[in-house]
């Protein structure tokens, strides 16, 4: 009887544990590639990562959830405003479905952006968090940025005379 109880408990424990989502490894590679491409400032290549239907959260105070066109404009704004952009990831982590808490194949990452403001020549380095969710074709359908975007823009703005 004790063996049966032990086997039942082990089976229950194993069945309740969540493993890695089968798409996570593929989506992780796409995420890493996105960062590699973004820093080259090849806007057309960056645009190709996004599905036609996207919801993306801006990092600016009060920033809206953006559609594809707005998201690409937002990203182009960063590329146009900065030079020598670099991403130094601290880690990449699996994401979870917000409703179920179960792994959903999405990718989250913490790291540092650095570069130089085009207009002022001032350099920056800031800690950021990003999350990306993908469709079955490996295109980004949801994502967002968290960091002090407004503070960064103010810190590297040209000095007022």
Feature-to-residue mapping (PLM):
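C-terminal motif of bacterial Sec signal peptides marking the signal peptidase cleavage site
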Residues: 12-15
């Amino acid at each position: 009887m004790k063996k049966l109880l032990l086997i039942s408990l082990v089976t229950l424990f194993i069945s309740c544990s969540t493993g890695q989502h089968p798409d996570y490894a593929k989506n992780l590679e796409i995420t890493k590639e996105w960062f590699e491409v973004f820093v080259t400032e090849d806007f057309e290549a960056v645009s190709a990562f996004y599905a036609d239907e996207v919801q993306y959260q801006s990092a600016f105070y009060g920033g809206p959830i953006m559609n594809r066109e707005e998201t690409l404009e937002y990203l182009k704004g960063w590329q146009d405003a900065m030079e020598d952009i670099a991403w130094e990831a601290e880690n990449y982590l699996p994401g979870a479905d917000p409703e179920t808490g179960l792994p959903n194949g999405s990718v989250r990452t913490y790291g540092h952006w650095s570069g130089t403001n085009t207009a002022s020549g001032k350099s920056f380095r800031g800690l950021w968090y990003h999350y990306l969710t993908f469709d079955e074709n490996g295109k980004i359908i949801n994502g967002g940025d968290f960091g002090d975007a407004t503070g960064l823009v103010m810190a590297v703005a040209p000095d007022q005379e």
